[in-house]
Amino acid sequence: MVYLDTDLMRFLDAQNKLYLTAFSEIKKGKKQTHWMWFIFPQIKGLGTSSVANYYAIHDLKEASDFLQHPVLAKCLIEISKLLLTFKRKSIESILGDLDARKLRSSMTLFAQVENADPVFREVLNTFFAGEEDMQTLSLLNSSSVKLAVA
């Protein structure tokens, strides 16, 4: 499946409005508003809300396309690096429990992309003792099987 820039527009549109808010909140060390879905997207199949489904990454190909997009990749890498400035804080104290789990899923997803920036692994190592999200890996594995069969 080939993804076009138009497929990623949902992220660009949302980030256009709220990326600076998300960045500012992380810089202050405390997430306060709702933006996780499109700043740190997860693989399709994890979220149950309509918003989570809308911003879900469909498979590893779309994750790769996301990281090849000049704006989306820059923003994801930049805000992920910003998180690392809080190495002495728990990620739950910054994002809350649920959003910390979403971050782990997102970092697991993007760490699987070939030649991905090492920041995704570094976030996993720093805040999650290097442990990837098993549900994300399972969903990626099942989506790659579907792609191979198609």
In which residue ranges do the predicted regions lie?
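Extreme N-terminal tail/first-helix region
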Residues: 1-20, 141, 145-147
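Short amphipathic alpha-helical segments and their helix-coil junctions
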Residues: 12-25, 83-91
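Amphipathic alpha-helical segments within well-ordered protein domains
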Residues: 23, 64, 107-108, 125
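Hydrophobic/aromatic-rich, well-ordered segments within soluble, folded domains that form packed cores
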Residues: 25-60
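Residue-level detector of well-ordered alpha-helical segments, enriched
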Residues: 31-38, 75, 99-106, 119, ...
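Short helix-capping/linker segments at secondary-structure and domain boundaries
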Residues: 45-51, 111-121
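Mid-chain, well-packed structural core segment of small domains
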Residues: 65-114
